[in-house]
């Protein structure tokens, strides 16, 4: 079982994440490449929140394919093309991921992604003991 924590000597997280996740040595790891807001039919959502929700749906599909669940998430790295998307990102994450054990997360605002129509990309790491 992964153990998430926020050390007392570190500031309170600025969002819904934790500062550390301890993964047992016996864990099976899954690394999910950056997911964008494209559905299984190859259609890119046009609105930011829909893209963000699709990113998380894609990640959950990758977890299921490997006999993992959202509680096995250890880390995400999120790339946004505009800092004004942060609140909508958080809403999309809560809507799709819901209340799970918190995992570590890094959010970065970048000038652009692989296509100007892609507004968000999320890479994920998961571990299952």
Task: Pin down the residues of each PLM region.
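N-terminal presequence-like segments and the immediate start of the first folded domain
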Residues: 1-57, 61-75, 80-129
């Amino acid at each position: 079982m992964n153990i998430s924590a926020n050390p007392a000597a570190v500031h309170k997280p600025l969002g819904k994440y934790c500062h550390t996740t301890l993964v047992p040595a016996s864990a099976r790891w899954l690394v999910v490449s950056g997911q964008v807001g494209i559905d299984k039919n190859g259609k890119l959502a046009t609105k930011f929140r829909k893209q963000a929700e699709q990113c998380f749906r894609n990640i959950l599909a990758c977890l299921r394919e490997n006999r993992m669940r959202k509680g096995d998430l250890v880390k995400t790295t999120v790339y946004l093309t505009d800092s004004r998307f942060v609140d909508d990102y958080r809403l999309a994450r809560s809507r799709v991921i819901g209340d799970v054990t918190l995992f570590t997360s890094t959010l970065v605002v970048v000038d652009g992604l692989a296509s100007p129509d892609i507004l968000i990309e999320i890479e994920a790491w998961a571990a299952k003991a």
